[in-house]
Amino acid sequence: MVAAGTTVVSANTVTAAAQAPVNLRSAGTFAILSQSGVTDVYASAIKGDVGASPITGAAIGLACSEVTGTIFAVDAAGPPCAVTAPTILTTAVGDVGAAYLDAEGRTFPNFVDLDAGEIGGLTLAPGLYKWNTDVNISTDVTLSGGPTDVWIFQIAGTLDQAAAKNVTLAGGAQAKNVFWQSAGAVTLGTTAHFEGTILSKTMIAMKTGASTNGRLLAQTAVTLQMNTVTLPAL
């Protein structure tokens, strides 16, 4: 058990090697990719591509003015600026599935069930973290490492971030190297800030005013409420 609030968690280099980033392939250009649609309370600001497949483009509830990037739809029922590109979307959705399995399948974790899933208040070093439980971020959490270091979080349950709490990066850590694989739903609380790519087996919900420097890659729905989602520097 690691006490929350003051602890710096260091990776166990004896039992696990440094992790390679999860390969997102064609999904890497998407700030948001969903299989069953995107709902939105206006106005959100999305910097990066947006797509939904196999569901109709009518399920993409974003205005063109909210997206700096390309909106891809499987048919002409999407927003008026959307590009109809079912083949691109089929490939990207398949790549999300492969990335999810890659993250889920990494072995020899540095930490298992750290703090029973309550990581608020911790500073986490690079490495592979595995939980057989839900994970909660009830207070700010920091990921501290260098620009090439990688964090992969394997979560068997849900991931919940409390309102007005932050995931922050320190020491040169980069959002492009942070991956959260969650078998359950992911909820980012009101005005919370999050870092990294979320690979969710189900849905991702951002509450009012929450922001993400990363990607929302959901195998069901994505719900937005006046949010900011920024694709990380590649």
Locate predicted features:
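Solvent-exposed adhesion/ligand-recognition segments of exported proteins
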Residues: 12-234
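Secretory targeting and sorting signals
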Residues: 1-13
